[in-house]
Swiss-Prot record:
The keyword Magnesium does not apply. Part of the 30S ribosomal subunit. Contacts proteins S5 and S12. The gene is rpsH. One of its GO terms (molecular function) is rRNA binding. This is Small ribosomal subunit protein uS8. Keywords: Ribonucleoprotein, Ribosomal protein, RNA-binding, rRNA-binding. Belongs to the universal ribosomal protein uS8 family. One of the primary rRNA binding proteins, it binds directly to 16S rRNA central domain where it helps coordinate assembly of the platform of the 30S subunit. GO terms for cellular component: ribonucleoprotein complex; ribosome. It comes from Campylobacter lari (strain RM2100 / D67 / ATCC BAA-1060).
Amino acid sequence: MINDLISDSLTRIRNAGMRRLETTQLLHSKVIEALLGIFQAKGYIESFNVIEENKKKFINVVLKYDEKGKSVINEVKRVSKPGRRVYKGKDEIKRFKNGYGTIVVSTSKGVLANDEAYKAGVGGEVLCTIW
């Protein structure tokens, strides 16, 4: 049984990128789907789609690589964990890696990237960072 679905999903994406796999399969949840929507909008993955097999939902993720075949994801890291929650205010999530990275935040307005959360004027639980 998986206790932390977000950590498991990020690890699967990281491992698939290191092995240069074209796709990887994740367990489905609404938070993971929102997280992947941000990754796709920011250009870290090509696409994703939800599939249902035997009444279970999965997400197929198509990874993105540069012209040299290297994954465009340099590092993806889980920040807030089940044993230690990390919360940041709107002023603390303004920029990450001088604008080259993204902080994904779970807010009262949904799961948002750091620039969207700053514009909306909300803070929240920091789910992960990616660059």
